[in-house]
Amino acid sequence: WKLAPALAAGDTVVIKPASDTPLSILELAKLLKDILPAGVVNVLPGSGRVAGQAILEHPGFAKLAFTGSTEVGRNVGLAAAKRIIPATLELGGKSANIIFDDCNFDKALEGAQMGILFNQGQVCCAGSRILVQDTIYDKFIAALKKEFEAVKVGRPWEEGVQVGALVDERQLKKVLSYVDIGKEEGATVITGGRRLTEDGLDKGCFMAPTLLGDVTPDMRVAQEEIFGPVAVVIKFYTEEEALAIANEIGRASW
């Protein structure tokens, strides 16, 4: 969605895909090859340290746009500031889904499930914090547990699969480590919290959809982006309290 408005404005674009997942952008470039003039959309695969740094230092760019970690995003922002050009940075999120007791229960369940499990939770705007009003907390969590456990995890091309693999082994280990961190902080695993290895999934980085309960807003699992199929559930009592919890983290603008 960053490409389309740039092209509509008459700009040329250089895209550096993520080092671990370059193929989709390369396939897109193949499709665009027969549609756009040469040089309008350019793909530069490679590591961030080499290809990414070359982009930051090249004088031919009038704007920088980055999606990724805060650490790298800081470098992108500094590079843009040095050259006095604009930069847009998407550096993660901890979006709050607020479930009130007068909600459309089924729609809220669907939204909470899809909000965190879409793309295995590897989305900047994943609904990773689920705030539930106290009067329906137990009922909602019980129903959401069933929803999570009904989700089919597997190879994306297989029928009925909703959740695929995480991007790599390193990311899977990071996400699982957050489950351990949550338990150490006092959270409970309502469902999931483990790697999936059955039915041939041992050859990939698959994880069971995970819900953590008994979470308080000050816990790391409620403060830090996990970037995986893990949602934390936080109980609230009043609208004012829910808004305060949601707004405490600046990464909630989604």
Predicted regions and their residues:
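Short, solvent-exposed loop/beta-turn-alpha elements that line the ligand-binding surface or hinge
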Residues: A222
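Phosphoinositide-dependent membrane-docking surfaces
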Residues: V233
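Conserved small/polar residues in nucleotide/adenosyl-binding loops
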Residues: A252-W254
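ALDH superfamily catalytic-core signature
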Residues: L36, E71-T216, T238-I245
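Glycine-rich nucleotide-phosphate-binding loops and adjacent flexible coil segments
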Residues: P229
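Rossmann-like NAD(P) dinucleotide-binding subdomain of oxidoreductase/dehydrogenase enzymes
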Residues: W1-K107, F236
